[in-house]
Amino acid sequence: MSSSRSGLTRVLVAVATALVSSSTPCPQAWGPPGVQYGQPGRPVMLCCPGVNAGTPVSWFRDGDSRLLQGPDSGLGHRLVLAQVDSRDEGTYVCRTLDGVFGGMVTLKLGSPPARPEVSCQAVDYENFSCTWSPGRVSGLPTRYLTSYRKKTLPGAESQRESPSTGPWPCPQDPLEASRCVVHGAEFWSEYRINVTEVNPLGASTCLLDVRLQRILRPDPPQGLRVESVPGYPRRLHASWTYPASWRRQPHFLLKFRLQYRPAQHPAWSTVEPIGLEELITDAVAGLPHAVRVSARDFLDAGTWSAWSPEAWGTPSTGPLRDEVPDGSRGHEQKLEAAAQEDSPAPPSPSLQPDPRPLDHRDPLEQVAVLASLGIFSFLGLAVGALALGLWLRLRRSGKDGPQKPGFLAPMIPGDKLPGIPNLQRTPENFS
């Protein structure tokens, strides 16, 4: 009894749903033919594919003779299922009033798309690529629509729909799923990426604004080689090349960082070399060393690249540098010779006395002598002029005023001086 009531309730709900959606057309084919899609917990409408619209049909589950919906339901060629769940997935068969086979429909359940997760990266200064992943697994066939446009400055409304700003399609990589590539981008411009996920139950869009100089991440350097330096048991020479994806231009260069460590040592030593090679001078003698290198834009745009594959090298175990014959000098001698050709080094000082006599005709020595004579002459003239000025001043002051007593005059009374009479007034002098 309860089962019959539940069945009746199910039919009534289906009829009500059908009446509400009677004007809704059948879902368009999406994916393989004869397959329709629905969402758990929602009503689903199936259409008989082999009859005209409105033709009454009977519906059965494939392999089951029990009638699901008769031709007198008033729904014509459509079957409505209310609040479907995983038990409703499968194949349904429709037949006309005279029992002619009308077709088969397979129902698959899933979820509508969620907002996809998008990230972009540039491996050079002209092109960038974007990859994405679904926000959730829908269980349904999915397509992605990708496009981009160049963003305009605030207030430039006249250029917002200009052909020079897009939108343009972002071509999807046929060899790599969920990836599209933008070619010929402007390094200092900002772009808006549109990735829309579409499945039979709907669509969801993600918009991402990117700047090329922010998402720049070069590929790792290539061709890393590590070589020993003959005669130097603590040296290694490492060299590498630019990544093939980076077009070398004078104003778009890369800088590098290099890490190395001896075998069985977990800690890395890091240096930032200048150019495409580095001479390691503190290697551990006799141990193999792992070396790796990464790259970044010379002006620090973006981020460092991933590390290159490790290369291994062991320092030289031969005789020391001073014991190496001239004919067997290694790579370091070539580097030193090339450096001397480009910029010859000054000769090293000698400890032996020079037997050659001094050449006083040296222009530098003559200039030094003349400078010394000039300084002494100036000082002599200055002292002479000062002495002459003092003498003239004293002479002029002696002619203009009365003569002053001598140096000893204040010390000896005048009447005691020999040959000078006593001029003091006494009564004898006036008598």
UniProtKB/Swiss-Prot annotation:
Q: Which Gene3D superfamilies match?
A: Immunoglobulins
Gene from which this protein is expressed: Il11ra1
Organism domain of life: Eukaryota
- Compositional bias (Pro residues) spans? 344-355
This one is known as Interleukin-11 receptor subunit alpha
Origin organism is Rattus norvegicus
Ig-like C2-type domain: residues covered: 27-110
Q: Which residues are glycosylated?
A: N127, N194
Record GO cellular component, one term: extracellular region
The GO molecular function terms of this record are:
interleukin-11 binding; interleukin-11 receptor activity; protein-containing complex binding
Q: Tell me which parts of the chain lie in the Extracellular compartment.
A: 24-371
Q: Where is the signal peptide?
A: 1-23
